[in-house]
């Protein structure tokens, strides 16, 4: 990054994208990027392949989660942040991941993300349902999705 470049609010995501190019920004960091919920994580949440080598990062607080198969590859969007291409899960996939990891981040966070995603029209019901099936949380999310309509 050039010395005179402006640092954005997503600087840590750009730094993570540069140091872990095969990783995908997920969960709380993806929620913050998409403007969903009130969570403001102090570390960057990154999804990596199940058998990938764990990156060693200095000067960057990061939490790694291991995803495999279609759960890793589905719903990836590429965004340009500070000149770096950063891979971030889309809103529907991020919400489904929040339900998948509800014991780690809290059910209240997942519900808030779902509510905000629906109210801000970041994803359709079909996109949310497809992501729920891929993340294998369709039965968990069904009552909450039904309550939205």
What are the roles of these predicted feature ranges?
Residues 1-149:
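Nucleic-acid-binding surface
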């Amino acid at each position: 990054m050039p010395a005179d470049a402006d640092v954005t609010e997503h600087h840590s995501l750009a730094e993570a994208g540069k140091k872990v190019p095969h990783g995908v920004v997920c969960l709380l960091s993806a929620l913050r990027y998409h403007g969903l919920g009130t969570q403001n994580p102090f570390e960057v949440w990154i999804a990596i392949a199940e058998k990938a080598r764990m990156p060693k990062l200095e000067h960057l607080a990061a939490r790694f989660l291991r995803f495999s198969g279609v759960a890793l590859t589905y719903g990836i969007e590429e965004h340009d942040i500070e000149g770096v291409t950063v891979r971030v899960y889309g809103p529907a996939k991020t919400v489904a991941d929040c339900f998948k990891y509800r014991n780690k981040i809290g059910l209240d966070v997942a519900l808030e993300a779902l509510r905000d995603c629906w109210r801000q029209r970041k994803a359709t019901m079909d996109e949310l349902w497809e992501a729920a099936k891929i993340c294998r949380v369709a039965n968990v999310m069904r009552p909450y999705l039904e309550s939205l309509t």
